């Protein structure tokens, strides 16, 4: 699933929760709960966890001369993160007296050095072969390199560089892709070794690394390196063919041998991520795309890696990093020529976050597109995702038709005609030249797809274009027409606060900026301006019918908090502004200033927070936001503690919806549109899950975080496949609590917390096509499983508590492991208690009775009563679930 679809997903998830609501407003944390397509690779990370720190050296290439690539690299990476450059030696003309380079070869070397001077005139340089320029028979004859001439030619290049520039030469690759350019280079592993031996005898190379490998196909890199590894200080391969396994193995071998792992032609951020994982320490970008590579170079040098995942057969990888300044970013990448489409799931184990503005959620599933074969349908896709949280987050997803309003001037971005400059103008509702469709770019756009397309409403082929692909500050922006967007027409939205964004160009990394403070100023791109001028760089995306103004709504009043066992219900007084869009709910642990936005743009004046932990004390505040995206001051804070008192904290009766009948409002979300069917044990409907369609239910993040736990449900299996999951609460293959109806011979309950796993195998397995009442209790150091009210297995000495696992991915019908079969079954009346109920209680609930403190609706007298839902809305008659009848809880 690509990021372009996130807005649709958010709407779909909301609709799934509320579609059946004819009488209830379900304003709770559960309205944001997604149920994603099962991912190929799942990655978990803790925002505050200790990560892995690396010290890579990243560089840029001019072996294939392209000054634009270097300028893009400087702008996206920052000069401080460029530590090496790759130049090249040529062999188009014979050496004079076996030592003197021709003038045209020197001119090319001087050109490369001059380009590198834009980074630093002392930037370290590595040489490789420029075989595409052509070959002279003096160097190669009958596809066999003349070793002595070849070594002399390399020596002459190094000598010239040392004598005529300040660039230190730190390494030399004797050949470049010698496994492929056999005619041009005449190389072989043996000839590469012989060149290395000659260079090693030369005092000039005493402090210069000789690089081994240097193959196009990474399957061949190890053999090209191993035969001469006693002469090679560095090992290098390209990834233009070859398996993931041999790529990783090559860098692991270099690390084992104490050599420098080097990649002098990286084509995708995936190579950099994988290389770091297995031993690469020096990497050079062959060409330079844009943001993902630049931000990866920054954060990998000034941060810690929190998570890493890979799919070897599909040649893709992903990682999550935390910068030393606190920013967190996720990256996905692939092979340039061999990738297969892969779905990656990112899971935050500590708190709800926003992925490029999508949230508040714990997880995101992102599709990394691939092709249909080697160099077939490949897009060289890569991406970076901002992971954010806090008191002021992006107010919503940007995907629609807007006017772009400049903060400094209050004017909107516009154009007069194609080919002319982008300007600021006073907004006119009738001018479509001031209206823009802003949408995430397609994941098939080619290369980095971390950007947005901005198209004119008047003509969707007209976009905001940086003239001539300029990377210079104060370059002009123009309206330009073409069928598909180019890199100088795509933009990154960087949220700054109070509804404002920076817009940064994909090609240049520079900022869209009003040229002056005038209301009719031209629009340019610039570097970061001094703080006093930065309002010229800030923009809001506003609907066409919303006036731009900067008067914030009044701060909300009357905030109250009602604590329940596993949730906190907030209510507040309504604001009176006519242009009010909604409310933002903020939460922090009591005694901290670590506020996070846990709900956005609520239309009602109540919200039930069920992402809180039982027993912890929280502070809450509410802000108002208007249609112009102005945020109010926060309300006065109020504190509340979900009590954790023994109770049923959630119940799903599957009555054509996944509503929780308790006041905690822990509504579920389903993937695959499972059906509701007759033939039930409670109410009128049951939920049918199809294994072939990979259907499952996701329960809220904190539903199983108590020290003790009871899960009760009715289940009728439609398959006896071993190791299906009735439920599985956890977040990865090392943290789970699951129940399978059969491990092949018996019901199994298993818990794992890191390296510690505890299992309970029962005396029976569940049959197919029969309704069975199943209860699992965990507490007091004991786990018990009941079927139809009878104990079928127990184990004492249980030391793992559900709260130790801290499950956040709580599934009905699927497992944490990608290999676990999906459940084929009908499910009904799922209940969760935050304590271990007794054997007598099991009998009671199986028989339709209620536990202490809750009476049955069927026992209420048939006379008029005051009947309310948990939301306080009066009803004409009791409905399925919990009702408040004459002030008492009644379960129907």
Residue ranges and their predicted role:
Residues 724-749:
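Glycan-recognition/cleft segments
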Residues 63-218:
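Substrate-binding cleft and catalytic face of glycoside hydrolase catalytic domains
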Residues 392-551, 670, 694:
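Lectin-like carbohydrate-binding module/patch detector with strong preference for beta-trefoil
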Residues 690-709, 759-765:
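Short surface loop/edge beta-strand patches of beta-sandwich-type extracellular domains
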Residues 795-826:
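Flexible glycan-contacting loops in extracellular carbohydrate-active proteins
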Residues 422, 653-677:
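Short, tryptophan-glycine- and acidic/Ser/Thr-enriched carbohydrate-recognition patches
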Residues 749-773:
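Short, aromatic/His-centered strand-loop micro-motif at the edge of beta-sheets
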Residues 609-630:
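Beta-strand-rich modules
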């Amino acid at each position: 699933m690509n990021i372009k679809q996130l807005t649709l997903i958010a709407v779909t998830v909301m609709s799934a929760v509320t579609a059946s609501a004819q009488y209830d407003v379900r304003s709770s944390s559960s309205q944001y709960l997604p149920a994603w397509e099962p991912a190929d690779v799942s990655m978990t990370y803790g925002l505050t966890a200790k990560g892995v720190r690396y010290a890579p050296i990243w560089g840029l290439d001019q072996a294939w001369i392209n000054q634009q690539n270097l300028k893009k690299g400087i702008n996206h990476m920052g000069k401080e993160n460029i530590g090496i450059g790759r130049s090249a030696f040529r062999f188009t003309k014979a050496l004079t007296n076996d030592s003197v380079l021709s003038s045209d070869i020197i001119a090319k070397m001087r050109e490369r050095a001059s380009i590198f001077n834009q980074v630093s005139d002392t930037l370290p340089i590595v040489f490789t072969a420029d075989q595409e320029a052509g070959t002279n028979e003096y160097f190669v004859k009958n596809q066999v390199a003349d070793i002595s001439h070849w070594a002399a030619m390399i020596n002459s290049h190094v000598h010239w560089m040392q004598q005529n520039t300040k660039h230190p030469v730190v390494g030399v690759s004797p050949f470049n892709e010698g496994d492929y350019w056999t005619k041009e280079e005449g190389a072989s592993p043996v000839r590469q070794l012989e060149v290395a031996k000659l260079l090693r005898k030369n005092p000039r190379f005493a402090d210069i690394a000789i690089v081994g490998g240097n193959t196009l196909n990474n399957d061949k890199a190890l053999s090209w390196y191993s035969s001469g590894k006693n002469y090679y200080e560095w090992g290098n391969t390209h990834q233009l063919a070859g398996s993931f396994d041999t790529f990783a193995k090559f860098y692991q071998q270099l690390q084992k041998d104490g050599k420098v792992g080097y990649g002098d032609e990286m084509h995708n951020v995936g190579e950099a991520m994988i290389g770091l994982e297995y031993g690469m320490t020096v990497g050079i970008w062959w060409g330079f795309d844009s943001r993902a590579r630049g931000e990866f170079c920054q954060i990998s040098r000034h941060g810690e890696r929190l998570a890493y995942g890979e799919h070897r057969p599909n040649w893709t990888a992903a990682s999550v990093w935390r910068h030393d300044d606190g920013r967190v970013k996720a990256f996905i990448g692939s092979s340039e020529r061999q990738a297969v489409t892969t779905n990656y799931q990112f899971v935050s184990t500590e708190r709800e976050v926003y992925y490029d503005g999508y949230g508040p959620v714990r997880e995101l599933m992102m599709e990394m597109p691939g092709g249909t074969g080697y160099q077939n349908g490949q897009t060289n896709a890569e991406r970076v995702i901002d992971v954010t949280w806090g008191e002021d987050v992006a107010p919503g997803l940007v995907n629609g038709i807007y006017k772009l309003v400049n903060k400094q001037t209050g004017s909107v971005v516009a154009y007069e005609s194609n080919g002319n400059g982008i300007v600021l103008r006073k907004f006119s509702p009738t001018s479509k030249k001031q209206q823009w469709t802003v949408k995430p770019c397609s994941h098939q756009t080619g290369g980095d797809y971390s950007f947005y397309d901005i198209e004119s409403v008047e003509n969707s082929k007209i976009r905001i274009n940086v003239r001539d692909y300029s990377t210079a500050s104060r370059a002009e922006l123009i309206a330009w027409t073409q069928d598909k967007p180019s890199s100088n027409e795509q933009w990154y939205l960087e949220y700054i606060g109070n509804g404002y964004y920076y817009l940064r160009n994909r090609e240049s990394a520079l900022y869209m900026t009003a040229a002056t403070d005038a209301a009719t100023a031209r629009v340019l791109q610039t570097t970061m301006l001094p703080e006093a001028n930065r309002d010229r760089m800030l923009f809001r995306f506003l609907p066409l019918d919303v006036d731009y103004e900067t008067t914030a709504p009044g701060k909300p009043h009357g905030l109250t908090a009602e604590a329940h066992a596993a949730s906190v219900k907030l209510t507040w007084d309504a604001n009176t502004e006519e242009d009010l869009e909604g409310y933002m709910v903020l939460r922090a642990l009591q005694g901290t200033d670590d506020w996070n936005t846990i709900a956005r743009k609520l239309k009602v004046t109540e919200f039930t927070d069920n992402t809180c932990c039982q027993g912890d004390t929280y502070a809450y505040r509410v802000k108002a936001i208007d249609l112009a995206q102005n945020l109010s001051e926060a309300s006065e804070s109020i504190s509340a503690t979900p009590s954790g008192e023994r109770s049923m904290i959630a119940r799903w009766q599957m009555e054509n919806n996944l509503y929780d009948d308790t006041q905690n409002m822990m509504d579920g979300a389903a993937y695959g549109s499972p059906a509701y069917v007759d033939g039930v044990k409670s109410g009128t409907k049951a939920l049918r899950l199809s294994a072939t369609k990979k259907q499952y239910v996701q329960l809220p993040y904190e539903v199983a975080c108590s020290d003790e736990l009871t899960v009760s449900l009715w289940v009728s299996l439609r398959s006896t496949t071993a190791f299906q999951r009735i439920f599985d609460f956890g977040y990865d293959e090392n943290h789970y609590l699951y129940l399978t109806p059969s491990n092949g011979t018996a019901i199994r309950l298993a818990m794992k917390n890191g390296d510690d796993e505890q299992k309970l195998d029962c005396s029976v397995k569940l049959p197919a096509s029969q309704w069975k009442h199943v209860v699992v209790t965990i507490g007091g150091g004991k786990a018990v499983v009941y079927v139809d009210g009878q104990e079928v297995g127990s184990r004492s000495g249980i030391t793992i508590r559900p709260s130790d696992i801290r499950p956040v991915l709580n599934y009905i019908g699927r497992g944490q492991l990608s290999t676990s079969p999906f459940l084929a079954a009908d499910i009904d009346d799922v209940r969760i208690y935050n304590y271990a109920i007794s054997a007598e209680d099991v009998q009671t609930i199986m028989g339709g009775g209620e536990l202490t403190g809750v009476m049955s609706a069927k026992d209420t007298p048939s006379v008029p009563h005051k009947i309310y839902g948990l939301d306080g809305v009066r009803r004409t008659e009791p409905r399925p679930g919990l009702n408040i009848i004459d002030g008492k809880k009644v379960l129907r």
